[in-house]
Structures are given as C-alpha cells and as structure tokens.
Regions:
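Electrostatic, structured charged patches in enzyme active sites and in nucleic-acid/phosphate-binding
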Residues: 1-210
Length: 210
C-alpha cells in the first residue's frame, strides 16, 4: 500500500508505504512537540549489503519547555508480525541504523501498531473528517472570541451554551462542526489522548486547560 496523505492547514503532502506508516504520519502531524519530519530522507550504509537501508521517517523536535534540545528520532514503522517473521533480515539493517543515528546525535526507534494505533489516532481520524468543511469565518471568530473570554476550564458543551444561551436542539449540530474544524486546524487545542465525548475540555494555544 502506497500513497500520500494531506495534512495541516495548507494540505501539505507526505508519502507513505503502508497503512501503519500513514497512521504514524497522522500522529506526527498533531504532535505539538514535532518541529518537522522528513519521509525516507536518510540512507544508512549496511555492512555486507550493496543497497543502503532507508528508515521511514526522521523526526525533529522543538526545544523542550526549559529550552533543552530534544534529540531527533530516526524511525522505522513495522507491524509486530512482520518484525517477528523477518527478524533475521532486519537485524543488520537495524543495527546499522542504530549506530548511524548515534553518530548524528539521534535515536533510532522501531514503532509498531501498539504505540501508533491508540486513542490519539482515533481522535485524529475523527477530526480529519472536518478538514474539507467550508470555512465559516463569522462563526469561527465567534468561537475563538468566546473561548478566549471563558478562559481555562472551558468545555465544548459550555462553549456552545455560551454561544447559544437560549439553547435549542440545533445548537450543538451548528457549532460542533465549527469547533472540530478549528481543532483540526490547531486553532483550538484538546487532549487527544482521552476519548472524545459531548463534553471535551478545550483551550486556545498556549492557554492550557487547568
């Protein structure tokens, strides 16, 4: 399976060679600690092999909260069953990649579906459904302004109730798609590691919920 996945507000394109790799790229796109990533940009010489080994992704991170540098990750994405079945074939490649990464000040990591296909991925896939929703500038600005006035402790439900004090059966149907689109665009933030429900804590960037 190969293809390209669009991400971000400008629909940037990244290539993938498996569905698991596609899922990992989606997770990277919503990871605030990631500065940028490069797909198959590194070739690692493997002793005894004519062809170099090309790991899937090189991930670079923003400095930590105290300004400390975070070492980049050179990442291979593989399902557990393939890793087990082809362990002998992969061993020299992974050994070479780990050694090469150390010379660059990187970490070499092997990720499987256990660490990729999580609640975070489920939430990201839900939010992606709103990426092509037509922009509604007036409502989007109203959401941002109201969330700013509510401050920390706001939830999706309290935000809608503040936008539509009179309530009504259609208020959530009207406002939730606007809110989720803004979350997808990262103009509003939520905790992606917890299940999304009708009441979801949310906040503006750099104004983390308490």
């Amino acid at each position: 399976v190969t293809g390209r996945v669009a991400h971000g507000p400008n629909s940037e394109q990244s290539g993938f060679e498996s569905l698991l790799e596609k899922d990992y790229l989606l997770c990277l796109q919503f990871d605030a600690s990631v500065e940028h990533f490069e797909v198959q940009s590194v070739q690692v010489p493997v002793p005894g092999h004519r062809k170099p080994y090309t790991p899937d992704v090189l991930v670079r991170y923003w400095p930590g909260p105290r300004g400390g540098l975070i070492e980049p990750d050179l990442v291979e994405v593989k399902p557990k069953d393939i890793l087990k079945r082809k362990a002998e074939e992969f061993a020299p490649k992974f050994k070479a990649a780990a050694a090469f990464a150390r010379t660059q000040g990187w970490n070499f990591r092997i990720l499987t579906e256990e660490s990729i296909r999580t609640q975070r991925l489920e939430n990201i896939k839900f939010l992606r459904e709103f990426r092509r929703r037509p922009q509604d500038s007036a409502r989007e600005q109203a959401v941002v302004n109201m969330l700013s006035s509510l401050g920390t402790g706001a939830t999706s439900a309290s935000l809608v109730q503040s936008l539509e004090p009179s309530g009504g059966v259609d208020s959530f149907a009207i406002w939730y798609p606007v809110i989720w689109r803004l979350v997808y665009l990262r103009k509003i933030e939520i905790d992606l590691d917890v299940p999304m429900a009708e009441i979801v804590p949310l906040w503006l960037p750099n104004r983390r919920a308490s």
